[in-house]
């Protein structure tokens, strides 16, 4: 077995793919189920049993407690009750993105954030040009939202070439989009506030913020207080689904700490040697608490939202009566065409124009491997505004006939948005086919950002994607020294992180430590220490290496542990580039921007660089 083949492993762990949002077959299945229930609702509402559709969803459900009594129709129970779980999941994703996800890098996040804001404003403006006044003008909120579930499924169906970065961009955009839509519901679609229940809701939110301090039973506490908050908001006449967002935002999220994971592994070994209830409880608790409750809830609740809540919501809300009268009325309705224009044209123009502006002015930058034409295809797909659009139809429009016209507009817009996106991806891929993944360096060398050795203006550039726990990368350091000696000032050497945790569980933490050293100008000095002690890469060891190379240990601790988001994102950013290029082994070299294939001993690298002169 060759060294290269010995180091080849499977794809990156999901940590580098925005965690729960990595491409999964369940995403496609959830979107297909949502579509199936949408079609079922339309067929039911237009079948000989159409009357039963209205009767069932309009049936009142009464809940009484002593002298208190509340009545909700089945449809409102779905929209106000079950949909709180949908907004809960959205809120968890929002919190995760801002704390440990794409939105931690403000320059990278700026483009999708501004594009999302434009994608909220431009559709609303276009809608209001069709409906400037009257009751229909209140429905402007219908056109501001993108359906994340359908977006993910539709992107999988269209299958644009190399969609990894586009998918991250669109999901980041969708998070901000959801925040805007939820804010619109809170500010513009809530009236007749009751102050006493609202005060109780504020106290409950304060209590929720303190739950994280409990030593145990935090999950049940979140559930009980969250349900109480839902009731308080309902009584305050604030849309109770916002309780889901409030609870989610107050739930902590963090990346797993290697030390805690290793402690749990030790407990597992102890349990294996001496099985007993005490060890069993300790192992269970250690495993549970090594992952943030935010991520655990996304995993636990998310499938129920995708496969139960959203299909039921679609069944309850998509039942548009498409008789000749409804279709005729919709085809001549400014409400219908305002929704179509807002979603299809507004989303496309707003997102694409804002992205172009941010890139042109330098106020933000697109992620590596992502171009404006790819964003344009994704912007068109963002016109699928199904879930929250139908949700706001029911909130903003009182007349059932006008509601049907609005739903027809949402359905037409979704079909047109999908068709436009498919056409854009097919045409742009045909006119300017993307290069095969991995043959060309996806992100050019940036001396201000990258870790470099040599003259930034050198004619020869050697980029290495490596792993500090990889023994072959450790051996390659000697080869790199020979290559640098051979070429002198004619060579610029660049190191980028590619920690393969599946094979090397301490490699990610080692990369973090090197970034902590980089903050004090000693990146390569720390790298030498890490390669020299590859069998000793616990945090206690790396703190010792930090002292050995003369780092300010307090500052190092702040950078890698207390304020770790910058360090985490830097390592993740390099690893995501490697994922985009479909790299699967270390070390991987790029010679003058082109992937080096073959041996990476000093003589082979020198020959490859000489050929590139």
From Swiss-Prot:
Gene3D superfamilies: Glutaredoxin (3.40.30.10), Na+/H+ antiporter like domain (1.20.1530.10). The keyword NAD does not apply. Pfam families: Na_H_antiport_1 (PF06965), Thioredoxin_4 (PF13462). It catalyses: Na(+)(in) + 2 H(+)(out) = Na(+)(out) + 2 H(+)(in). Keywords: Antiport, Cell membrane, Ion transport, Membrane, Sodium, Sodium transport, Transmembrane, Transmembrane helix, Transport. One of its GO terms (biological process) is regulation of pH. InterPro entries: Na/H_antiporter_dom_sf, NhaA, Thioredoxin-like_fold, Thioredoxin-like_sf, Thioredoxin_domain. Residues 409-613 form the Thioredoxin domain. It comes from the Bacteria. Its main location: membrane. GO terms for molecular function: oxidoreductase activity; sodium:proton antiporter activity. It is found in: Cell membrane. Residues 1-23 are annotated as: Disordered. It is a multi-pass membrane protein. Residues 1-408 are annotated as: Na(+)/H(+) antiporter NhaA. The chain crosses the membrane at residues 29-49, 81-101, 110-130, 138-158, 168-188, 191-211, 231-251, 300-320, 337-357, 377-397, 408-428. GO terms for cellular component: plasma membrane. In the N-terminal section; belongs to the NhaA Na(+)/H(+) (TC 2.A.33) antiporter family. Na(+)/H(+) antiporter that extrudes sodium in exchange for external protons. This is Na(+)/H(+) antiporter NhaA 1. It comes from Mycobacterium sp. (strain KMS).
């Amino acid at each position: 077995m060759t060294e290269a083949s010995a180091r080849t492993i499977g794809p990156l762990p999901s940590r580098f793919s925005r965690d729960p949002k990595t491409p999964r077959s369940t995403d496609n299945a959830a979107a297909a189920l949502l579509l199936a229930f949408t079609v079922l609702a339309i067929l039911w509402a237009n079948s000989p049993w159409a009357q039963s559709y209205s009767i069932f969803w309009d049936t009142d459900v009464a809940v009484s407690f002593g002298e208190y009594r509340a009545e909700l129709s089945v449809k409102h129970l779905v929209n106000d009750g079950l949909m709180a779980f949908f907004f809960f999941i959205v809120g968890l994703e929002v919190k995760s993105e801002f704390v440990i996800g794409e939105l931690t890098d403000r320059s990278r996040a700026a483009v999708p954030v501004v594009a999302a804001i434009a994608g909220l404003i431009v559709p609303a403006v276009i809608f209001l040009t069709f409906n400037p006044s009257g009751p229909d003008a209140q429905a402007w909120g219908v056109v501001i939202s993108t359906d994340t579930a359908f977006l993910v499924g539709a992107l999988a169906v269209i299958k644009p070439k190399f969609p990894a970065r586009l998918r991250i961009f669109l999901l980041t955009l969708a998070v901000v989009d959801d925040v805007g839509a939820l804010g619109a519901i809170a500010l513009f679609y809530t009236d007749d506030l009751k102050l006493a229940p609202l005060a109780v809701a504020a106290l409950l939110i304060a209590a929720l913020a303190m739950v994280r301090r409990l030593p145990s039973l935090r999950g049940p506490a979140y559930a009980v207080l969250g349900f109480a908050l839902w009731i308080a908001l309902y009584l305050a006449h604030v849309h109770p689904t916002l309780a889901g967002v409030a609870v989610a935002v107050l739930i902590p999220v963090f990346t797993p700490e290697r030390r805690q994971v290793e402690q749990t592994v030790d407990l597992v070994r102890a349990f294996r040697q001496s099985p007993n209830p005490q060890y069993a409880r300790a192992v269970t608790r250690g495993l549970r608490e090594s992952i943030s409750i935010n991520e655990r809830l996304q995993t636990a609740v998310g499938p129920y939202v995708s496969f139960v809540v959203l299909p039921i919501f679609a069944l309850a809300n998509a039942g548009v009566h498409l008789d000749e009268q409804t279709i005729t009325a919709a085809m001549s309705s400014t409400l219908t065409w305002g929704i179509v224009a807002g979603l299809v044209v507004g989303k496309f123009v707003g997102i694409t124009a804002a992205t172009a502006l941010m890139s042109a002015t330098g106020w933000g930058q697109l992620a590596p491997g992502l171009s404006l034409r790819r964003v344009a295809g994704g912007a068109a797909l963002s016109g699928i505004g199904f879930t929250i659009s139908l949700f706001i139809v029911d909130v903003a429009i009182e007349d059932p006939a006008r509601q049907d016209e609005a739903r027809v507009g949402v359905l037409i817009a979704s079909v047109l948005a999908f068709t436009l996106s498919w056409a854009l991806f097919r045409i742009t891929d045909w006119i300017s086919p993307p290069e095969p993944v991995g043959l060309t360096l996806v992100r050019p060398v940036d001396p201000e950002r990258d870790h470099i050795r040599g003259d930034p203006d050198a004619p020869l550039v050697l980029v290495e994607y490596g792993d500090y726990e990889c023994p072959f990368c450790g051996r390659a350091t000697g080869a790199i020294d020979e290559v640098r000696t051979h070429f002198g000032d004619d060579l610029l050497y660049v190191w980028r992180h590619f920690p393969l945790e599946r094979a090397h569980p301490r490699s990610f933490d080692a990369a973090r430590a090197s970034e902590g050293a980089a903050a004090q100008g000693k990146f390569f000095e720390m790298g030498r220490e890490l390669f020299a002690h590859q069998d000793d890469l616990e945090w206690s060891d790396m703190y010792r290496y930090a002292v050995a190379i003369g780092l300010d240990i307090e500052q190092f601790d702040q950078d890698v542990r207390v304020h770790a988001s910058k360090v985490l994102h830097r390592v993740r950013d390099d690893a995501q580039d490697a994922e985009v290029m479909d790299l699967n082994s270390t070390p991987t070299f790029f010679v003058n921007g082109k992937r080096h294939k073959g041996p990476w001993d000093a003589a082979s690298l020198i020959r490859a660089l000489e050929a590139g002169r």
